[in-house]
């Protein structure tokens, strides 16, 4: 029987994959400290000091209406005020930022 991630486990896995990907992109990565934080990761580019506030999302694909297309997630109003951006994590480990594919 194949292993199946629970929703929480899938989210945690995606956060670790995203952190590893960001480290490879030359970022320092800091994890959230509370369950209901508006962001999952804070990443600081090592050379420029640019700061990214990131909400990590596991990619989901539509099963009906345009099957196979990615479901686009939208930051909440509060996340938008804070400048949080979405980082998608695909099942194969690829990552990309919302709107920057």
Identify the residue ranges that each predicted region occupies:
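Mixed-charge (Asp/Glu-Lys/Arg
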Residues: 1-38, 42-101
């Amino acid at each position: 029987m194949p292993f199946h991630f629970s929703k929480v486990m899938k989210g945690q896995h995606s956060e670790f994959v995203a952190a590893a990907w960001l480290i490879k992109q030359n970022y320092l990565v800091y994890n959230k400290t509370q369950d209901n934080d508006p962001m999952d990761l804070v990443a600081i580019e090592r050379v420029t000091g640019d700061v990214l506030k990131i909400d990590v999302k596991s990619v989901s694909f539509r099963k009906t209406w345009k099957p196979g297309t990615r479901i686009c997630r939208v930051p909440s109003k509060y996340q938008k005020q804070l400048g949080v951006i979405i980082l998608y994590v695909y099942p194969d480990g690829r990552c990309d930022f919302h709107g920057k594919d």
